UniProtKB/Swiss-Prot annotation:
InterPro entries: Tudor, UDP_glucos_trans, UDP_glycos_trans_CS
One function term, GO molecular function aspect: UDP-glycosyltransferase activity
Residues noted as binding UDP-alpha-D-glucose in the record, renumbered to the chain: 289, 341-343, 358-366, 380-383
Glycosyltransferase as UniProt keyword: yes
Cross-referenced Pfam families: UDPGT
Sequence similarity: Belongs to the UDP-glycosyltransferase family.
Keyword Disulfide bond set for record: no
Stated name of the protein: UDP-glycosyltransferase 90A2
Keywords: Glycosyltransferase, Transferase
Organism: Arabidopsis thaliana
Enzyme class (EC, first level): transferase
Domain of life assignment: Eukaryota
Transmembrane parts of this sequence: none
Length: 467
């Protein structure tokens, strides 16, 4: 059967970590080969437009701006992306996210001027877009930046109230549906299990997002079937909402890399090239663009890297590392401050043999696709649950352990870094991640990959039936 013309609307949340995988999804949709043409319209705000234009250069995607509201309490003027917030705490994240609802009227007005929409994919944080889809009569799918494992574990913890009566932050409790997995209170957002939390603005926002998700036509995950088969199978059997695993989306840009010739090689790439030419292995260190790390913890990380004696490239915000650190490590380390780097290119560099990561899902999938083993240092949100997946289930990562006061000490960091880069454990993790990296590449192969087939099924379902 010949497919009708397909028009997909994408609306990513206003954060680079959320935009990037959805823009990769846009490229995947536009590269899809079947009888009907696909058009993609991406919604954003004026100040985010340049980043999206650059990310989708060379494609036929249409980009539509919707104004972000002015004078939002607590949000500095001119901020339209969470990366620009002074700090990503609930006191700023919640009003920023709530403010996006003020865009709804303009969003719907723009939608009505577009060609018929086959379906919309919008971020789970943009809960109000479900109402827009219902009013205008097209299906909405929710895009989640989490993996399936974290989603079903979270669901089990809340449905079973597993941690409501647990007093200790570190007491392990088995997840009923997955008894081999143990979670702790400290793996979740602080005070999430306090009865008083139900009146908290952040908790209410989560409830709105979950309610909206349950009214949608399904969820798209940036994962692939062979990466977490137990959890994907469980979700499909137990949940009413449909699931489509269409990742790893970071692979979508790979075909462009050979075509784009860099005019000016960045300093960090030159440094990596020098290390490669000298036969030196490098640890890549990055904790995401929005991580909040105490000065004490930063100091311990720095001293741990210094003590480890390994070569490292550290992408860091600000200038809060202890005095004299860079002079002491010399050519063994390179600091990249307040600069946007191409993380995928770093991880794919021949010299990079390990990744000290905060366990954001984008970072973990990029590391797996690049076949680089991970030292897990989860900081917030669902990152501790992501760490459980890569450490205990996939065995592509080792995890640092915090001392009793909650700080990971320099000795622990130095020991785990050396083991990852030079030890037997590191070799085992490298073998495992190489196997998953090959599976990841196969998942997106045209015509035979599981994620390609899942995308085919998604398009067929919503474009032939129109429901």
């Amino acid at each position: 059967m010949e497919l009708e013309k397909v028009h997909v609307v994408l609306f990513p949340y206003l954060s680079k970590g959320h935009m990037i995988p959805m823009l990769q999804l846009a490229r995947l949709l536009l590269s899809h080969s079947f009888a009907g043409d696909i058009s993609v319209t991406v919604f954003t705000t004026p100040l985010n437009r340049p980043f999206i234009v650059d990310s989708l250069s060379g494609t036929k995607a249409t980009i539509v701006d919707v104004p972000f509201p002015d004078n939002v309490p607590e949000i500095p003027p001119g901020v339209e992306c969470t990366d620009k917030l002074p700090a990503l705490s609930s006191s700023l994240f919640v009003p920023f996210t709530r403010a996006t609802k003020s865009m709804q009227a303009d969003f719907e007005r723009e939608l009505m001027s577009l060609p018929r929409v086959s379906f919309m994919v919008s971020d789970g944080f943009l809960w109000w877009t479900q109402e827009s889809a219902r009013k205008l009569g097209f299906p909405r799918l929710v895009f989640f930046g989490m993996n399936c494992a974290s989603t079903v574990i979270c669901d089990s913890v809340f449905q079973n109230q597993l941690l409501s009566n647990v007093k200790s932050e570190t007491e392990p409790v088995s997840v009923p549906e997955f008894p081999w997995i143990k979670v702790r209170k400290c793996d979740f957002v602080k005070d999430m299990f306090d009865p008083k939390t139900t009146t908290d603005p952040g908790f209410k926002l989560i409830l709105d997002q979950v309610t909206s998700m349950n009214q949608s036509q399904g969820i798209i995950f940036n994962t692939f079937d062979d990466l977490e088969p137990v959890f994907i199978d469980f979700y499909k059997r137990k949940r009413k909402l449909k699931l489509w695993a269409v990742g790893p989306l970071c692979y979508v840009n790979n075909f462009l890399d050979d075509e784009v010739e860099e005019k000016v090689k960045p300093s960090w790439m030159k440094w990596l090239d020098e290390k490669r030419d000298k036969g030196c292995n490098v640890l890549y260190v990055a904790f995401g663009s929005q991580a909040e790390i105490s000065r004490e913890q930063l100091e311990e990380i720095a001293l741990g890297l210094e003590e480890s004696k390994v070569n490292f490239l550290w992408v860091v915000k600000g200038n809060e590392i202890g005095k004299g650190f860079e002079e002491r490590v010399g050519e063994r380390g390179m600091m990249v401050r307040d600069e946007w780097v191409d993380q995928r290119k770093i991880l794919e560099h021949e010299s990079v043999r390990g990744f000290l990561s905060h366990c954001g899902w984008n970072s973990l999938t990029e590391s797996i696709c690049s076949e680089v083993p991970i030292l897990a240092f989860p900081l917030a949100a669902e990152q501790p649950l992501n760490a459980i997946l890569v450490v205990e289930e996939l065995r592509v990562a080792e995890r640092v352990v915090a001392a009793s006061e909650g700080v990971v000490r320099r000795e622990e960091i130095a020991e785990k870094v050396k083991e990852l880069m030079e030890g037997e454990k590191g070799k085992e993790l490298r073998r495992n991640v190489e196997a998953y990296g090959k599976m990841a590449k196969k998942a997106l192969e045209e015509g035979i990959g599981s994620s390609r087939k899942n995308l085919d099924n998604l398009i067929n379902e919503f474009c032939n039936n129109g429901t």
